[in-house]
């Protein structure tokens, strides 16, 4: 493996690409081949200080720019993203590993997030009520917070950052972005395209790194709010540390999404839907289907079809269109998932399809689609977020048992039901504990103009991302009562 021509990514601070203050770096491999494609700096406190200081200086001017003018930058950015959509998709596949089809889908979802940001003037409109008392009018106004920060994961290196900084910036804030050290090249490209539309320096800053950068942002007195997406332990840490320091925090965390399959479902469509929800993006997404609760009446027929279709899924380099499952992000993650599979077998689950047997011509971090039957809630593979193409089947008596099973999980991000019964779907919608619910919808992640967040250990905070929640998170309200004598 040669690394002689592999570049080291830089930080974007105060309108320029600058080297990190620390010499420490981490290799960024292509998950499909294991070959180094970049080095990412592990920036430190000094880099965070410089980025926040730049954002704070820029805020004093940026907050006075009229909101329609701020939004015009988003319209221009939108065109840049559309013009470069294929390049962005190829870059996602290169450093994340997901298939090119999934990468193109992510690019489209990212574009939709920026489309939402172009509606900021409408979303920031306040409310007014005249004559609330004799000669007194009342109104509500929205203002930006100041310097805000975003900490984003590797699994959606385009969509999640675009949940955050376009909306925050259009609302009048300035932004410090800390993306995953596993996918720095896509972040570099997103910032470069934003720079090309002429965004004033300091409005958007990028600091690469790991825990030192996270702690620097959490503890910096000039950072007003932090948006985070990642694992449950880190989300809990970010929320507790950030709020203890007086910051507004939204922390989207882990998931164990369940799909409920009833006897009256459209069986073939349900099987294909579950396969896409469970195994696309190699299962490395917080909305992946991880458990199917299928009623006994249809269990054998459903599992027979699901097993046959799962065995057909090809595994390999995501740049090739014919592959359905790409590599996992790192060898260390693959090793962890393999241990979960071993635990499933040891604890009594029936392994119907073993993804450990997947082979590829390239030396990447490959794990094929894996399917378990006869899983119980006492098993580790039911309890933990695996973040992998591993699907567990639990057989249940009826809808009530399926709902109770789903609600037993400590996670509550998304849940889906497959049924032809409106009555059953309505009951499921009302009884299930999940932030996002799908009815014959494979992945219940709505468009960007709806809010996105889970419940229980899947989310820490009050306001989710996107939609009305998004604009409320990045702004504060002022309630004004006024009377005039002249």
From Swiss-Prot:
Instruction: List the catalytic residues.
Output: 286
Might you give the EC number(s) for this enzyme?
1.2.1.27
- UniProt GO molecular function: malonate-semialdehyde dehydrogenase (acetylating) activity; methylmalonate-semialdehyde dehydrogenase (acylating, NAD) activity
Q: Provide the alphabetized UniProt keywords.
A: NAD, Oxidoreductase
Pathway field of the UniProt record reads:
Polyol metabolism; myo-inositol degradation into acetyl-CoA; acetyl-CoA from myo-inositol: step 7/7
Q: What class of enzyme is it?
A: oxidoreductase
Question: SUPFAM superfamilies of this UniProt entry?
Answer: ALDH-like (SSF53720)
**Binding residues annotated for NAD(+), in chain numbering:** 154, 178, 181-182, 231, 385
* Catalyzed reactions: 3-oxopropanoate + NAD(+) + CoA + H2O = hydrogencarbonate + acetyl-CoA + NADH + H(+); 2-methyl-3-oxopropanoate + NAD(+) + CoA + H2O = propanoyl-CoA + hydrogencarbonate + NADH + H(+)
Task: Describe the subunit structure.
Answer: Homotetramer.
Function recorded in the entry: Catalyzes the oxidation of malonate semialdehyde (MSA) and methylmalonate semialdehyde (MMSA) into acetyl-CoA and propanoyl-CoA, respectively. Is involved in a myo-inositol catabolic pathway. Bicarbonate, and not CO2, is the end-product of the enzymatic reaction.
Similarity-based family: Belongs to the aldehyde dehydrogenase family. IolA subfamily.
Q: This protein is called what? A: Malonate-semialdehyde dehydrogenase 2
Organism the protein comes from: Shouchella clausii (strain KSM-K16) (Alkalihalobacillus clausii)
Name of encoding gene: iolA2
């Amino acid at each position: 493996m040669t690394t002689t021509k592999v570049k080291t990514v830089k930080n974007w601070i105060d309108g320029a690409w600058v080297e990190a203050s620390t010499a420490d770096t981490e290799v960024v491999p292509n998950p499909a081949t294991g070959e180094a494609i970049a080095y990412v700096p592990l920036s430190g406190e000094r880099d965070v200080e410089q980025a926040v200081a730049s954002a704070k200086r820029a805020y004093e001017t940026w907050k006075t720019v009229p909101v329609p003018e701020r939004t015009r930058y988003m319209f221009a950015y939108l065109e840049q993203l559309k013009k470069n959509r294929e390049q962005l998709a190829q870059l996602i596949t290169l450093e994340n590993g997901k298939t090119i089809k999934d990468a193109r889908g992510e690019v489209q979802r990212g574009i939709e997030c920026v489309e939402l940001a172009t509606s900021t003037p409408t979303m920031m409109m306040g409310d007014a009520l005249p004559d609330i008392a004799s000669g007194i009018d009342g109104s509500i106004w929205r203002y930006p917070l100041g310097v805000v920060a975003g900490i984003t994961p590797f699994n959606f290196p385009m969509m999640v950052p675009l949940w955050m900084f376009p909306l925050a910036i259009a609302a009048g804030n300035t932004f410090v972005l800390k993306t995953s050290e596993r996918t720095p090249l896509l972040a570099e490209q997103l910032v470069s395209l934003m720079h090309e539309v002429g965004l004033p320096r300091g409005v958007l800053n990028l600091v690469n790194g790991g825990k030192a950068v996270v702690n620097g942002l959490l503890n910096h007195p000039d950072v007003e709010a932090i948006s985070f997406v990642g694992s449950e332990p880190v989300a809990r840490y970010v929320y507790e540390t950030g709020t203890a320091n007086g910051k507004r925090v939204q922390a989207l965390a882990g998931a164990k999404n369940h799909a409920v399959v009833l006897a009256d479902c459209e069986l073939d469509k349900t099987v294909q839907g579950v396969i896409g929800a469970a195994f696309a993006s190699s299962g490395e997404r917080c909305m992946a289907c991880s458990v199917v609760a299928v009623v006994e009446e249809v269990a054998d027929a459903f599992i027979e079809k699901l097993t046959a279709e799962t065995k057909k899924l090809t595994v390999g380099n995501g740049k090739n269109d014919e592959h359905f499952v790409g590599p996992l992000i790192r060898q260390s993650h693959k090793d962890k998932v393999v241990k979960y599979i071993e635990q499933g077998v040891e604890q009594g689950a029936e392994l119907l399809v073993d993804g450990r047997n997947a082979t590829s011509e390239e030396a990447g971090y490959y794990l094929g689609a894996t399917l378990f039957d006869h899983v119980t809630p006492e098993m580790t593979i039911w309890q933990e977020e695996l973040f992998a193409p591993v699907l567990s089947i639990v057989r249940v008596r009826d809808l009530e048992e399926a709902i109770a099973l789903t609600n037993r999980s400590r996670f509550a991000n998304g849940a889906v039901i497959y049924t032809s019964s409106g009555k059953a779907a309505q009951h499921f919608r009302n009884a299930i504990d999940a932030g996002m619910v799908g009815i014959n919808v494979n992945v219940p992640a709505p468009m960007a103009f709806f809010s996105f967040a889970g419940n229980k250990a899947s989310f820490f905070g009050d306001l989710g991302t996107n939609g009305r929640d998004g604009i409320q998170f990045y702004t504060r309200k002022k309630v004004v009562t006024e009377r005039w004598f002249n």
